[in-house]
UniProtKB/Swiss-Prot annotation:
Membrane topology, from the record: Multi-pass membrane protein
GO MF terms, alphabetically ordered: metal ion binding; metalloendopeptidase activity
Family indicated by similarity: Belongs to the peptidase M48A family.
The UniProt record lists the keyword Protease: yes
Biological classification of the source: Eukaryota, Fungi, Dikarya, Ascomycota, Saccharomycotina
Name the UniProt record assigns to this protein: CAAX prenyl protease 1
Protein EC: 3.4.24.84
TM helices/strands, residue ranges: 13-33, 90-110, 122-142, 168-188, 198-218, 307-327, 358-378
Function: Proteolytically removes the C-terminal three residues of farnesylated A-factor mating pheromone. Also acts to cleave the N-terminal extension of the pheromone. Does not act on Ras.
PANTHER family attached to this UniProt entry: CAAX PRENYL PROTEASE 1
Major subcellular location class: endoplasmic reticulum
Catalytic reaction annotation: Hydrolyzes the peptide bond -P2-(S-farnesyl or geranylgeranyl)C-P1'-P2'-P3'-COOH where P1' and P2' are amino acids with aliphatic side chains and P3' is any C-terminal residue
GO annotation, cellular component aspect: endoplasmic reticulum; endoplasmic reticulum membrane; mitochondrial outer membrane; nuclear inner membrane
Gene designation per UniProt: STE24
Length: 453
């Protein structure tokens, strides 16, 4: 009888080579896409629908900005691939695990030194997260204070950058720690039939995140100010009343303290009241009609049940991942290859980790690397679904009579954000969650004022 678990649990399977190969293949594929996009940026002509909307100076700046981001993307990908290969080649996971155990033994009283694998996993992930943050500091610094600064977008100070990082790590430990503990305890409690318990748990976490993050977490990083009474507020409330949108409050967020990029969105569970959030950069630079048109698009996502659709898709994606994980999560050869053993028969491994139970967190992290080919394919699917949603939301705003103002707002945002004008189709189908501006304007049947005249 065909038993996938037994077939995969074989000491001769080169797990390190497989994961390294998948990682290199993903890097090569994504680098190829970036190369295609970089070549596309050499084009000196705008898409026809943008010819009367974008001046030469803006087009030139946009091309330079996009090229700089493409180069940085390649460097970042090389940097991240090198990290992954170093971790695999030099068995850094068991080394960090030993550090975690030593830290626990140093902190806890002697009688608690034989701590559980779950406790060791939590400490391991805390150390790994801290190490990853430190290793990624140069990339983060360059992104904000060199690349974004060069093109006039960065408003961050070094002090605010460091403060944000400390807050993020603190929240990750304070909130992520208990969530991870419960996640691992499910495997501990239900080692053979964890799938449905994990599904329910992650669904609850997702719903709580959608509820808690906008109301309690995001205000720790930005100031949310109620929109003042006036023309804009009346226009938004009138739109909400017209379409039956369950509007609760409208806030303006001080996004300008970090970046000059603009955005607008709403928060709230699918069947509850909603909060609309406007970036101050949007409020200060766009007309009332344009902002209302942008929100008509956002409300289109609500009216078309896109949030519900994405939650369902997310759950199906999660189910697929954990269904596949059942075939390998207790695979002895898989853990042994990376230095984790349940007994002392460690062969030639120099500094093995001996645990009472399978360290699920290690297995899941490495398993995600095995999923690289599947996740690359899923990326195309997720981008397609998201782009379809954007077209539908645009069509909804057009149906409400906001076509021209939405187009003007999209063009204005494109100019102010120096967004890419010419995009390679394969690159965008993988990386872009939104259609390009040219694609959206074409779908909306936009005709510039110059051509009308």
């Amino acid at each position: 009888m065909f038993d996938l678990k037994t077939i995969l649990d074989h000491p001769n399977i080169p797990w390190k080579l497989i994961i390294s190969g998948f990682s290199i293949a993903q890097f090569s594929f994504e680098s190829y896409l970036t190369y295609r996009q970089y070549q596309k940026l050499s084009e000196t002509k705008l898409p026809p629908v943008l010819e009367d909307e974008i001046d030469d100076e803006t087009f030139h700046k946009s091309r330079n900005y996009s090229r700089a981001k493409a180069k940085f993307s390649i460097f970042g990908d090389v940097y991240n691939l090198a990290q992954k290969l170093v971790f695999i080649k030099y068995d850094l996971f068991p080394k960090i695990w030993h550090m975690a155990v030593s830290l626990l033994n140093a902190v806890l009283p002697v009688r608690f030194h034989m701590v559980s694998t779950v406790a060791q996993s939590l400490c391991f992930l805390g150390l790994l997260s801290s190490l990853s943050t430190l290793v990624d500091l140069p990339l983060s610094y360059y992104s904000h204070f060199v690349l974004e600064e060069k093109f006039g977008f960065n408003k961050l100070t070094v002090q605010l950058w460091i403060t944000d990082m400390i807050k993020s790590l603190t929240l990750a430990y304070a909130i992520g720690g208990p969530i991870l503990y419960l996640f691992l305890k499910i495997f501990d409690k239900f080692p053979t039939d964890f799938l449905w318990y994990i599904m329910v748990f992650l669904f609850v976490v997702q719903i709580l995140a959608m509820t808690i993050i906008p109301v309690f977490i995001m205000p720790m990083f930005n100031k949310f100010t109620p929109l003042e009474d006036g023309e804009l507020k009346k226009s938004i409330e009138s739109l909400a009343d017209r379409v039956g949108f369950p509007l609760d409050k409208i806030f303006v967020i001080d996004g300008s303290k970090r970046s000059s990029h603009s955005n607008a969105y709403f928060t709230g569970l699918p069947f509850t009241s909603k909060r609309i959030v406007l970036f101050d950069t949007l409020v200060n630079s766009n007309s009332t009609d344009e902002i209302t048109a942008v929100l008509a698009h956002e409300i289109g996502h609500w009216q078309k049940n896109h949030i519900v659709n994405m939650v369902i898709f997310s759950q199906l994606h999660t189910f697929l991942i954990f269904s596949l994980f059942t075939s390998i999560y207790r695979n002895t050869s898989f853990y042994n290859t990376f230095g984790f053993f349940l007994e002392k028969s460690t062969g030639s491994f120099v500094d093995p980790v001996i645990t009472k139970e399978f360290p699920i967190i290690i297995g899941f992290m490495l398993f995600n690397d095995l999923l690289t080919p599947l996740e690359c394919a899923m990326q195309f699917v997720m981008s397609l679904i998201s782009r379809t949603h954007e077209y539908q939301a645009d069509a909804y705003a057009k149906k409400l009579g906001y076509k021209q103002n939405l187009c003007r707002a999209l063009i204005d945002l494109q100019i102010k954000n120096l967004s890419t004008m010419n995009v390679d189709p394969l690159y965008s189908s993988y990386h872009y969650s939104h259609p390009t501006l040219a694609e959206r304007l074409t779908a909306l049947d936009y005709v510039s004022e110059k051509k009308k005249n």
